[in-house]
Amino acid sequence: MSDAAVPPKKASPKKASPKKAAPKKAVAKKTPAKKTAKKPAVKKPAAKKRAAPKKKPAAAKKAVTKSAKKHAAKKAPKKAVKKAPKK
């Protein structure tokens, strides 16, 4: 058992050096990851700004059609009555 405990102790300092090298690689990978994260973030607001004007008129048109139908429904019978005798 004492022999088995000795090799892990020797291996731990060896593992420490790769760990030191790993953070350097991780730092290099983190910077590009941040750049890629910023690009989609910039594109998403632009897409929202572009889509918003298209969606808002569509919603406005729907709201206008609903209100227009209500007004037209009120005005339509009056116009129909007026147009009927003229025809």
UniProtKB/Swiss-Prot annotation:
Q: Where is this region: Disordered?
A: 1-87
Q: Which GO terms describe its molecular function?
A: DNA binding; structural constituent of chromatin
Tell me where the transmembrane regions lie: none
Q: Which residues form a coiled coil?
A: none
Which keywords accompany this UniProt record?
Answer: Chromosome, DNA-binding, Nucleus
For bias type Basic residues, the affected ranges are 11-87
Q: Which InterPro entries match?
A: H1/H5
> What processes does the entry annotate via GO biological process terms?
nucleosome assembly
Q: What is its main location?
A: nucleus
Its localization reads:
Nucleus; Chromosome
| Any one GO cellular component localisation term in the record | nucleus
Indicate what this protein is called per its UniProt record.
Histone H1.C6/H1.C9
Q: What is the lineage of its organism?
A: Eukaryota, Discoba, Euglenozoa, Kinetoplastea, Metakinetoplastina
